[in-house]
Swiss-Prot record:
Protein name from the UniProt record: Carbamoyl phosphate synthase small chain
Gene that produces this protein: carA
Catalytic residues (UniProt): C266 (nucleophile), H350, E352
Residues annotated to bind L-glutamine: S47, G238, G240, L267, Q270, N308, G310, F311
EC number: 6.3.5.5
Reactions catalysed: hydrogencarbonate + L-glutamine + 2 ATP + H2O = carbamoyl phosphate + L-glutamate + 2 ADP + phosphate + 2 H(+)
Oxidoreductase is among the record's keywords: no
């Protein structure tokens, strides 16, 4: 691995390093993630579509990769930036090195750069466009052309790009040491899950709590969902700007009116907010990491959460029937809401983690409780 690589940012910053993945070029929004582990889950999180991820922890790749840690069917991150790739990897579950994994998935990546300097730039100036090019003929001029062609994340409807194209069933539960992924004996709740870029651990955590899932494409109508007679509806995470997803906003409005229990995560949270008349905005400093403190305003407790979003809901635009349930202790941005007149609630972060803590896993239990109450009514 001695092929030179070049990273260029929209502000003109240039970093020279070494290619550690697929040979070629890529562009996207450059962000940083503070997670110390879980690089494979990050790479395969569809929410990172069109984003080049900088990992702030210096040594990445120590534990290799394996088939069980995939959060989707492929790598969705546009590229990877790290400080150091160890020569050796070691883990009892490892089946492949990170380098080989990146090459097989045609993911462009760069190492041997000062990620502390890069993170400081992104922290001070905010996420911005960037490009990685590999090979001796990589030039700053080519990188600038790629950055200009990419533009920004504003206005990009990426949910349609990462969503499944056909409806499928899911029953597999969470992973257990020595057992692998376990399917519960009983799954009394039927949940229709919208795939806007859903992570598999979300599906597994719902399945482990007794949910039989029907996963539907992003553009599925509310009428088609209600025809399946679900006990509840789940709105998944996903990439891009929520405002262009007018097809989803329209469907969510009708689903809310139906009175079905609804739970949304990440993009799903933003779509619920837009459906009830609130506004979203592009964050200058996006949230990406597994150590974000959030306050549960109902209990007063502080929970450590996994976060991955570049857009947020404007709390000042919420209607009267939406109450705020969670807020970020980093920047006070809105993290969760609940409707006072419908069994609908949502959370901006990732209760399923992967990677990260599961301090807010109780939100899955809340969803189960809402469905149980609805079945008794």
């Amino acid at each position: 691995m001695s092929t030179p690589a070049l990273l260029v940012l929209a502000d003109g910053s240039v970093f020279h390093g070494t290619s550690i993945g697929y040979e070629g070029s890529t562009s996207g929004e450059v962000v940083f993630n503070t997670s110390m582990t879980g690089y494979q889950e990050i790479l395969t999180d569809p929410s990172y579509c069109k984003q080049i991820v900088t990992l702030t922890y210096p040594h990445i790749g120590n534990t290799g990769t394996n088939a069980e840690d995939e959060e989707s069917r492929s790598v969705y991150a546009a590229g990877l930036i790290i400080r150091d790739l160890p020569l050796l990897h070691s883990n009892f579950r490892a089946s492949e090195s990170l380098h080989d994994y990146l090459v097989r998935n045609k993911t462009v990546a760069i190492a041997d750069i000062d990620t502390r300097r890069l993170t400081t730039l992104l922290r001070e100036k905010g996420a911005q466009g960037g490009a990685i090019l590999t090979g001796a003929d990589a030039t700053i001029e080519k990188a600038q052309e790629l950055i200009a062609a990419f533009g920004s994340m504003v206005g990009k409807d990426l949910a349609k790009e990462v969503s499944c194209t056909e409806t499928y069933e899911w029953t597999e539960g969470e992973w257990a040491l020595g057992k692998g992924f376990v399917t519960p004996d009983e799954q009394p709740y039927h949940v229709v899950a919208y795939d806007f870029g859903v992570k598999t651990n979300i599906l597994r955590m719902l399945a482990s709590r007794g949910c039989r899932l029907t996963v539907v494409p992003a553009q599925t109508s509310a009428e088609d969902v209600l025809a399946l007679n679900p006990d509840g509806v789940f709105l998944s995470n996903g990439p891009g700007d929520p405002e262009p997803c007018t097809y989803a906003i329209k469907a969510v409005q009708k689903l809310i009116e139906s009175g079905k229990p609804i739970f949304g995560i990440c993009l799903g949270h933003q779509l619920i907010s837009l459906a009830i008349g609130a506004k979203t905005l592009k964050m200058r400093f996006s949230h990406h990491g597994a150590n974000h403190p959030v306050q549960d305003l109902d209990s007063g407790k502080v929970v450590i959460t996994s976060q991955n979003h570049g857009f947020a809901v404007d709390a000042d635009t919420l209607p009267a029937n939406a109450r705020i349930t969670h807020k970020s202790l980093f920047d006070n941005t809105l993290q969760g809401i609940e409707l006072t007149d419908k069994p609908v609630f949502c959370f901006q972060g990732h209760p399923e983690a992967s990677p990260g803590p599961q301090d807010v896993g109780y939100l899955f239990d809340k969803f189960i409780g809402n469905m149980k109450a609805a079945k008794r009514a």
